[in-house]
């Protein structure tokens, strides 16, 4: 997978994060929004009506949210099905669920790709094992979106956690690398 596939491209996305995710009123979000409910600022053309003013409106969390490229991948997948925007709500629940799974896959890919830069395959079995897990996650990300519902993320999270700790050990300490580990 290319690094650019793991970077959000909001212009190529149907604002799936503005529907699929939930948030609670806090310093990052001015109001509560349950998962599966369209954000009150989402327009019919899948754009944020207040994007240029998020911080002032009490929504800095929206500005820093990172889907790791999962949003545009899901948008492409559903566009192929003939559902090109959020206006077609027939498959909202499955699209939202698939997006949330794919986002975790993309985040794990990003973490392991970054770790691989620190510990390349030439540094023994850590690099080779990283490459194998990256390939496994890449295959999940590239599979048809409906296959995501059959993915057990637990073993992949565990593998990522172990690999990131091993990279930390190989680099002389775990502290910096542990901050990358997905614990959920």
Which residue ranges define each predicted feature?
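Ferredoxin-like iron-sulfur electron-transfer modules
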Residues: 1-10, 30-38, 180-184
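Short, solvent-exposed segments of well-ordered alpha helices
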Residues: 1-4, 33, 89-99, 124, ...
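Ferredoxin-type iron-sulfur electron-transfer modules and their immediate structural context
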Residues: 2-17, 159-167
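Local cysteine-cluster metal-coordination motifs and their immediate loop/turn environment
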Residues: 7-24, 37-68, 96-106, 110-113
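Short, flexible helix-adjacent loops and helix caps
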Residues: 22, 26, 117, 142-145, ...
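Surface-exposed helical/coil interface segments that assemble multiprotein signaling complexes
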Residues: 55-88
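Charged, amphipathic alpha-helical linkers/stalks
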Residues: 75-135
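Extended, small-residue-rich solenoid/repeat segments and analogous flexible loops
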Residues: 136-184
């Amino acid at each position: 997978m290319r690094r650019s596939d793991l970077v959000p491209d909001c212009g190529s996305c149907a604002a799936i994060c503005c529907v699929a995710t939930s948030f609670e009123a806090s310093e990052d979000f001015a109001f509560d929004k349950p998962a599966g409910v369209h954000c009150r600022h989402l327009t019919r053309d899948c754009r944020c009506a207040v994007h240029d003013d998020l911080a002032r409106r009490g929504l800095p969390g929206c500005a820093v949210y990172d889907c790791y490229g999962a949003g545009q991948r899901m948008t492409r997948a559903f566009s192929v099905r003939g559902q090109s925007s959020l206006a077609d709500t027939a498959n909202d629940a499955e699209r939202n669920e698939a997006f949330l799974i794919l986002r975790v896959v993309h985040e794990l890919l990003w973490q392991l790709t970054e770790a691989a830069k620190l510990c390349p395959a030439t540094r023994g079995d850590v690099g080779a094992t990283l490459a194998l897990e990256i390939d496994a996650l890449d295959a999940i990300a590239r599979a048809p979106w409906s296959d995501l519902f059959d993915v057990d993320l637990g073993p992949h999270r565990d593998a990522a956690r172990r690999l990131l700790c091993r990279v930390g050990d190989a680099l002389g300490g775990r502290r910096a690398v542990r901050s990358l580990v997905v614990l959920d």
